Regions:
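Extended, charged amphipathic alpha-helical segments
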Residues: 72-150, 155
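Structured, hydrophobic secondary-structure cores that serve as assembly/anchoring elements
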Residues: 132, 136-199
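Helix N-cap and loop-to-helix transition residues
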Residues: 21, 116, 181-184
């Protein structure tokens, strides 16, 4: 069923990870990684009375196609951080920096980085984004990288190029029904170079 849903052409999935759902999140992340297309946002809630623990992410820390967001569960009861951040992010030009997402209406920022450096280090170790004040003035997402450390913008841009090239080559082949010969190969190379030149 997941493959059928995945094949419907989505670009992003947001999955809220509740306590006990970690195995599902890991499996979903590995699935998206294997497809090498699309982007998974995991939204993890944490217990405000305990130190954050993202150790379950160790199994998928090399996954490039998974972005993790997290807020204290008392501040994010409806898993709105990932959804709001993603909604704001996709309005921006392809390849924009995920860090500079701010003014998320339904998300309550951390109060002026009320966690210390050691607390923030737990987030940064796994490139987990939270919502906090930057320089005590502007609320922003604290991290714009996937689990493996690759920029979210780069991964989205990679998918954009892949989709555009695939669509244009497919259109050429369907509309022209060219024979398989050197001229057709050169035409396909020109299509690909055209997409890359205008990227």
């Amino acid at each position: 069923r997941l493959l059928k849903y995945y094949g419907a052409g989505f670009e992003y999935i947001v999955y809220p990870v509740a306590s006990g759902d970690e195995d599902v999140a890991v499996a979903l992340s590995n699935f998206v990684e294997e497809q090498d297309m699309g982007y998974l946002f995991l939204n993890i809630t944490t217990d405000p009375t305990k130190p954050v623990d993202f150790s379950t992410l160790d199994q998928i820390k090399d996954n490039r196609s998974t972005k993790v967001t997290s807020l204290n569960s008392t501040l994010d009861p409806n898993f709105v951080l990932a959804s709001n951040a993603l909604g704001k992010y996709v309005e921006q030009p392809i390849g924009s920096n995920f860090n500079f997402i701010d003014q998320l209406g339904e998300v309550q920022p951390q109060d002026r980085y009320e966690f210390g450096y050691d607390d923030l280090a737990a987030y940064e170790k796994y490139n987990v984004a939270t919502y906090a004040y930057e320089n005590n003035t502007t609320p922003m997402i604290t991290n714009g990288r996937s689990l493996s450390g690759v920029s979210t913008g780069i991964m989205v841009y990679k998918d954009y190029l892949t989709r555009t090239i695939t669509n244009r080559v497919t259109d050429y082949l369907v509309q022209n029904k060219p024979p398989y010969n050197a001229a057709t190969v050169k035409a396909i190379i020109s299509i690909i170079q055209g997409v890359l030149a205008n990227a």
